[in-house]
Structure formats: structure tokens, C-alpha cells
Amino acid sequence: MEALIPVINKLQDVFNTVGADIIQLPQIVVVGTQSSGKSSVLESLVGRDLLPRGTGVVTRRPLILQLVHVSPEDKRKTTGEENDPATWKNSRHLSKGVEAEEWGKFLHTKNKLYTDFDEIRQEIENETERISGNNKGVSPEPIHLKVFSPNVVNLTLVDLPGMTKVPVGDQPKDIELQIRELILRFISNPNSIILAVTAANTDMATSEALKISREVDPDGRRTLAVITKLDLMDAGTDAMDVLMGRVIPVKLGIIGVVNRSQLDINNKKSVTDSIRDEYAFLQKKYPSLANRNGTKYLARTLNRLLMHHIRDCLPELKTRINVLAAQYQSLLNSYGEPVDDKSATLLQLITKFATEYCNTIEGTAKYIETSELCGGARICYIFHETFGRTLESVDPLGGLNTIDILTAIRNATGPRPALFVPEVSFELLVKRQIKRLEEPSLRCVELVHEEMQRIIQHCSNYSTQELLRFPKLHDAIVEVVTCLLRKRLPVTNEMVHNLVAIELAYINTKHPDFADACGLMNNNIEEQRRNRLARELPSAVSRDKSSKVPSALAPASQEPSPAASAEADGKLIQDNRRETKNVASAGGGIGDGGRIGDGGQEPTTGNWRGMLKTSKAEELLAEEKSKPIPIMPASPQKGHAVNLLDVPVPVARKLSAREQRDCEVIERLIKSYFLIVRKNIQDSVPKAVMHFLVNHVKDTLQSELVGQLYKSSLLDDLLTESEDMAQRRKEAADMLKALQGASQIIAEIRETHLW
């Protein structure tokens, strides 16, 4: 085992550097029948006489032997308080006051130390008899023993009671089954190597050790066969076929050893002398196999198996070291080198921050957020999604009802009854609706301002980690950018307010889109009027026989012919146009845009005035369709005295045809013009925000930072590192160096040959 000691020591340094758990080497579990030489094999591997020996049943309790490597300078370094079995199993605490090079300690004796291995052997016998009795009884309760030595590796060996068939002494009748279950409990651990011990003077085909090993390890990946007592075979026979695997092949190999006899033990023959005599015996009896058998070769084979296990763990350890090295290298880079030229460093950091801030807005930053929108992408989302959807959700006629429209029309006419809808009422109502676009526009400015504030934090956290070295510089940069954004906010709000005020200042009824909408609306209303007259005029005329109907409208039958309806429509329209022309020439109507010229041409804009004049027949039809709504009474009710100081009480009455049509016209005009203004606002507000806020900050950010921070009087204060920065830089450099050394150690272990 000595060959593994330097490897394990190197790995220990690696684990201490990386902070990983120590590789747990496999347990070596020895199984076999009674008196097959199991304990002798373990003693030869450890190199110490510490196990009870004798004839018959000697090992009657499992012995878990933990070998703990200690360097000579670590002896008597600490004191361990290890009373809990779980804690004791994983503990590597030493004890002070030990003068010997090697010592042992039992779990059941707590902190008592044993420097004489004869005392250890005697304590094992005493503890066995205390639990199992002194008459061949067997107990599954293990004995825990730790041996501390500079000549061992951190390894666990398990010595189990030998398999038996017939109970003796105090053994129960099912002793065979109990021992079998005990053995299976230990060898079922996948992280164990099974030493299947078989005596050479028995037939290997009847080996109970190999049989039970194959139950848990059918592929033979962790089973090593050991043939003991080669010197006790019958005269004229040898174990050549068995050792060469011709009888029963074993994947990991079959190794023969020669144990000390009871006479040798009684004569105090040392393990070293026994190994020397064993080598001489093998050279004499098995010269061709001498170099592949014996206790030394068994130890080398176990070393090889343990090294394979270690190497299987190295790739994961190597990956962890590489990841940590990359992290510490990045951390060291973020700490930067000590500042020599403060002026150049300050200018470099300011320039880098300004560049990263602008790049984040443009979408070309080095560190791009993947979990959410940020920077310019979020500003775009605010413009075209948040702001756009908010404007589209504003109802053009929201907050308006028929009473509001009629009241506005009446208030605009003053004391005189109006022949046409005054343009003042349209402007009053449409301005009221346009004013509702100002609040979402200002909210758009606020959202963009908040996002530009968030970009500051984004650049500080991801893009310019060097600023973390200088907390005062970081705070100063944040303050300058925040002040710049704060100064631009009222300017941008004022511009957005002006955009809405511009729309309110002049209602352009000659806007091309508005003129097209009015023309299309006139055609639709005119067509609806003709269709309604042609469909319902005959029934209306028959119910009013006392009134005088123009001869052109008198029906020839209950359902007039299409020609008669068309003729009646034509005359009504001509009458309306004549009346409209006469009134227009007298100066009535809404503005100059609706005036018909001397040549009798139709107006291009404001043509909707003509539809406000209706014929008597159409009023007769419309009165039947109008619905009652609460409206201020024009005259007092009969039977009630009138007091002009009383508040008028709304009563329900039907809208006249003209009132109904006036409301419909105003609503359509408001909606048409509101959509035009909303389109303008939706286009102009983002442009104003970009010009007065976003682009202005981008263009002036670096000059603002340089002007306020790049001053000789501020250099020392701004570039003062945090108190622990130098210490953290040193720790990161030391850790990086240690990780590089650990990586080199792993490379050396991969190239280590133990045989």
C-alpha cells in the first residue's frame, strides 16, 4: 500500500484546494469459510499483527478496520471527541499525547488509545466475548477499529466471520443463514472489492466464497480470488491449474499466498519474515508463477484496483477544477490591476460606461439580457405595444351621450334657434375628446424615463464590473446620469403637452382624411334616407289624410311603383337643395367651407350642412322611430304653475328627426376627426420622446460625465478602492495559482504507474 500513499497525499492537497469531498476508496471485504485464512490475508496487507488468530471459530463479529494515514508532523495535533458512530466513521481527528509512530483507537472505548498492537488484539477478543459470549457465539454487531499510521492509506478493510454449515457451541441452528445474510450485507455495497478466500487444500469448485460473491457480482467486476495455504497441499499435487484459471476463471485474477502457520504465530514470526519465506516457497514450487502470486503481488493488485477507481473519479474532479479556475480568472480580471495612471483609468471607465449605456439602447451591448426585454428593445415595446394599445383603447365617443351633444349644440346657438348645427359645438366636443389623449402620452414619457433609469443599473451589474472596484466612482456616475435624465423629463413632457395643444389649437376640417370621411358619410346618409322614404312613405301618408300632400308624392296604389318613388325622392331632394341654397346665400350654416358658389357647385368640405335640412314628410316618418329620452321641457306642463326659480325637472320625450340626425352627424364627425388626431399623436409622441429624451441623453452622456467627473481634484477620491478589494485580489490570485497546481497534480496522477 505504500505506493498509493504519495498519490493519496497529492489528491488530499487537491481536495483541500477545490473544497470537494475526499474520494472514498472502495472497502475491501474478505469472505470465506472458517479457517480459510481470511484474517491472515488482512494482516499481511496491513503489515501488523493485530487480529486474533487460532483454530476453529475465531472471528465471531465483523471487524471494520479503518486505516488512517497521518504524516509524521501531524502526530498529536488534535484531540477528537468521537462518540457518535456516524461521526466517528468519517472522522480523521488525531489525538495529542501519542508518543508511538502508530496507534489504534476503538469506538466502544471512546478516546482510549492503544500503542501496543498486542493490546489491540486482546481488546478485540474481549469485545467479541462481551457481546457474543465465550462459547463460539456469533454476533452481527461490528467492532470499529481505527489504525493511525504514516505507512497506510485511507482505506477500510472488513473481516467477516467465516461461513459454516453446522452450529457449534452457543451458535443457533440457523447460523449458516445468519452468517450468509451478514456477508451479503457488506458485499452488496457496489463500492466494495470482494476478496474471495479459498484454501488451496480444498476443491475450488466447492468454494462458498466464490459462490456468494457471484450472487452480488455476477460479472466479476469487483471480485478477486485468493488461494491460501499453498504450502499445505497434498504431496504430489499443486495449484497450477487453479492459479492459471483453468478450473474456474475469475475476471480480476486468482492470486495464491502462503500464510503463517500457528507454530509461526506462537514463535512470534513477523509479517516481514513470513513474506520473505513465502517468496522463497513460490520460487521453488511455482517458479513460472512466482512473480504473479504472493502477498506483495496481492497488495500491488489491490493498489491497481484502487488506482483505477481513483482515475475514474478524476475526470469529474478535473472538470470542477477547470470551472473554478475560469471563475477565479474572471473574478481576478474584474478586480483589475492596481491603478498606476489614475487620470487615464478614470477617463477609460467613463468612456466605457457611456459606450455600454448607448450600446444597450441600440441593442449592441456585449451582455444581452435573455430573461426579459431591456434597453432599446423595451423602449420599442413601450412605443408600439403599450402606448399604441392604450391609445387604441380610448373610445372616440367615450364620456359623451346624446344629452351632452344636444346641450352643446343648443349652447352654441345662443338665444336664436339654429337652422344648422353650429361648427362651434363640433369643435367644443371634439376638443374635449382630443384632450383625453394627453394623459397616456405623458405616461409613455414616464415609462421610457423609467427604462433609461433601469439601463444604468444594467450597465453597472453586467457591462462594467470594473466599477465595483471604485464604489465612489460608481455612485458619482449614477448620480450624473440620473440628473441628466431628470433634467430632460420636463422638457420632453412639455413637448408632448405641446403636441396635444397643437391639435387642440386648430381643428382642420379641410384635412384630406376628414374631407374624404365627410363625403363618404354624406353619400351613406343620403342613400339611407332615400331607402327609408321609398320603404315607409306610403304607410305614413295614409295615416295622415287630413294633411296636404304634394301631388308628386300621392301614391297611385298602396305600394308605389319604383318610378313614382324615384320621382318623389327627386322632388324632395330638389326642394331641400333649393332651401339650403337660399339659406346659405343668406349667410347661415357652419363656416365658409360649406357655402355653395354662384355656379351652383356642390361644396368640397363641410358638405354635411345640407343634410341638416329635412322635409316635412321625412319628419313625419322619423317621429315614429324616435325613442323617448330625458330632455329639458320647452314649455310648462299643463295644470302646474310655473316658477322660474325652480330647477327644471327632466322629462322623457321623443327626439325629433332633426335632433336624432344632428346627434348622428356630430358623433360621426367627432369619431372621424378623433381617429385622425389619434393617428398623429401615436406617430409624433414616440418621435418627440426619442429626440428630446433618448437621443439627447445618448449624444450628451459622455460629455456630461467628463465635464462633471474628469477633474484632477476628484481623481483620488473617485478612484479609491473599497477596503477589502486588495485582499480579495490577493485571495483570488492565490486560489487561481492553487487550482493550476491541482490541475497539474491530476495530470501527474494519470501518468502514475504502480506496477
UniProtKB/Swiss-Prot annotation:
Entry GO CC: brush border; clathrin-coated pit; cytoplasm; cytosol; endoplasmic reticulum; Golgi apparatus; Golgi membrane; membrane
Modified residues (N-acetylmethionine): 1
Predominant subcellular localization, coarse grouping: cytoplasm
Variant or mutagenesis effect after changing residue 139 to A: No effect on mitotic phosphorylation
Residues that bear N6-acetyllysine: 616
Keywords linked to the UniProt accession: Acetylation, Biological rhythms, Coated pit, Cytoplasm, Cytoplasmic vesicle, Endocytosis, Glycoprotein, Golgi apparatus, GTP-binding, Hydrolase, Isopeptide bond, Lipid-binding, Membrane, Mitochondrion, Mitochondrion outer membrane, Necrosis, Nucleotide-binding, Peroxisome, Phosphoprotein, S-nitrosylation, Synapse, Ubl conjugation
SUPFAM superfamilies: P-loop containing nucleoside triphosphate hydrolases
Stretch list, region G3 motif: 159-162
Expression tissues: Expressed in all tissues tested (at protein level). Longer isoforms are preferentially expressed in brain.
Gene3D superfamilies per record: Dynamin, middle domain, P-loop containing nucleotide triphosphate hydrolases
Location relative to the cell: Cytoplasm, Cytosol; Golgi apparatus; Endomembrane system; Mitochondrion outer membrane
Region of interest (Important for homodimerization), residue spans: 673-687
Sequence positions bearing Phosphoserine: 542, 561, 626, 635, 656
Domain topic, free-text comment: The GED domain folds back to interact, in cis, with the GTP-binding domain and middle domain, and interacts, in trans, with the GED domains of other DNM1L molecules, and is thus critical for activating GTPase activity and for DNM1L dimerization.
Name of this protein: Dynamin-1-like protein
Organism lineage string: Eukaryota, Metazoa, Chordata, Craniata, Vertebrata
